[in-house]
């Protein structure tokens, strides 16, 4: 194999390893609960990786991160399995 092919293969394997979560769940499930910048009080759910459960929190309505679900069922489907 040429060195170019080997470098391409190494790069693809590195990319695959970085994008594959170790736990089998999406990386967004590892993010902390973040209420965001606004002041609305929207009941929402986030996955808590320490307790391995979906928990309720109040979302402010803007900003925040992807670990934010409208329903506990959506949180379970995404992060619990």
Curated annotation (Swiss-Prot):
<dbReference type="InterPro" id="IPR050098">
    <property type="entry name" value="TFPI/VKTCI-like"/>
</dbReference>
<keyword id="KW-0964">Secreted</keyword>
<dbReference type="GO" id="GO:0005576">
    <property type="term" value="C:extracellular region"/>
</dbReference>
<feature type="disulfide bond">
    <location>
        <begin position="54"/>
        <end position="75"/>
    </location>
</feature>
<keyword id="KW-0732">Signal</keyword>
<dbReference type="InterPro" id="IPR036880">
    <property type="entry name" value="Kunitz_BPTI_sf"/>
</dbReference>
<dbReference type="GO" id="GO:0004867">
    <property type="term" value="F:serine-type endopeptidase inhibitor activity"/>
</dbReference>
<feature type="signal peptide">
    <location>
        <begin position="1"/>
        <end position="24"/>
    </location>
</feature>
<dbReference type="GO" id="GO:0090729">
    <property type="term" value="F:toxin activity"/>
</dbReference>
<comment type="similarity">
    <text>Belongs to the venom Kunitz-type family.</text>
</comment>
<dbReference type="InterPro" id="IPR002223">
    <property type="entry name" value="Kunitz_BPTI"/>
</dbReference>
<feature type="disulfide bond">
    <location>
        <begin position="38"/>
        <end position="62"/>
    </location>
</feature>
<keyword id="KW-1015">Disulfide bond</keyword>
<feature type="disulfide bond">
    <location>
        <begin position="29"/>
        <end position="79"/>
    </location>
</feature>
<feature type="domain" description="BPTI/Kunitz inhibitor">
    <location>
        <begin position="29"/>
        <end position="79"/>
    </location>
</feature>
<dbReference type="Pfam" id="PF00014">
    <property type="entry name" value="Kunitz_BPTI"/>
</dbReference>
<keyword id="KW-0722">Serine protease inhibitor</keyword>
<comment type="function">
    <text>Snake venom serine protease inhibitor.</text>
</comment>
<keyword id="KW-0800">Toxin</keyword>
<protein>
    <recommendedName>
        <fullName>Kunitz-type serine protease inhibitor spermatin</fullName>
    </recommendedName>
</protein>
<dbReference type="InterPro" id="IPR020901">
    <property type="entry name" value="Prtase_inh_Kunz-CS"/>
</dbReference>
<keyword id="KW-0646">Protease inhibitor</keyword>
């Amino acid at each position: 194999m040429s060195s170019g092919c080997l470098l391409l293969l190494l790069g693809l394997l590195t990319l695959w390893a970085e994008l594959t979560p170790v736990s089998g769940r999406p990386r967004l499930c590892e993010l902390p609960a973040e209420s965001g910048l606004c002041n609305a009080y929207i009941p929402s759910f986030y996955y808590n990786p320490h307790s391995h459960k979906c928990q309720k929190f109040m979302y402010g309505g803007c900003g925040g991160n992807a670990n934010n679900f409208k329903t506990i069922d959506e949180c379970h489907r995404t992060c619990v399995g």
